[in-house]
Amino acid sequence: MAEEQQANGAAAENQQQQVQFAIQRIYAKDISFETPSSPAIFRKEWKPDLKLDLNVKHEKIEDGVYEVVLTLTATNKVEDDVAFLCEVHQAGIFTIGEEVQDGQLAHMLGSFCPNILFPYARECVSNLVNRATFPQLNLAPVNFDAIFQRHMQQQAEQAQGQQTADA
């Protein structure tokens, strides 16, 4: 009996330590696809030069509710001509418990949520490229944790540089 109460107490403690997190909605906020060099681009030998840009923004909607927007821009050039320009704003509304501390919240908004959104954005880009009859584009996974850590390190260095300049 005492063991059962101890197990129940441990389970309750684990539930209290878990962060409340829920996905309310994932949606395409904005989609753009351009082929400025068509139809001439289709006659050129396909030697693409792909450039990818990622951006993450977040906004507090209400207490504990955040919109995170992952912007994925793919620009593909053949020689000096833009074959296509694809931009997808993949968004999500997430509930994050009030018990989350600032550093943990920044990590969830800057890394965890974009990791959830990226497969949707990647699929959208792939479908748009396919519909435009270009060769298939399969984007590699992105390590948002590493990007977030690098961003935090750059901010810390800038803050330290600012303090040194002010001294």
UniProtKB/Swiss-Prot annotation:
Q: Name one GO cellular component term.
A: cytoplasm
The record's comment on protein family reads: Belongs to the SecB family.
Name one molecular function that GO assigns to this entry.
unfolded protein binding
Task: Name the GO terms of the biological process aspect.
Answer: protein folding; protein tetramerization; protein transport
Q: Does the keyword Glycosyltransferase apply?
A: no
This protein's UniProt keywords: Chaperone, Cytoplasm, Protein transport, Translocation, Transport
Q: Name one Pfam family in it.
A: SecB
**Coding gene?**
secB
Give the protein's recorded name. Protein-export protein SecB
Q: What does the UniProt entry say about where the protein is found?
A: Cytoplasm
Provide the assembly information: Homotetramer, a dimer of dimers. One homotetramer interacts with 1 SecA dimer.
Lineage of origin:
Bacteria, Pseudomonadati, Pseudomonadota, Gammaproteobacteria, Alteromonadales
Domain of life of the organism in this record?
Bacteria
Its job: One of the proteins required for the normal export of preproteins out of the cell cytoplasm. It is a molecular chaperone that binds to a subset of precursor proteins, maintaining them in a translocation-competent state. It also specifically binds to its receptor SecA.
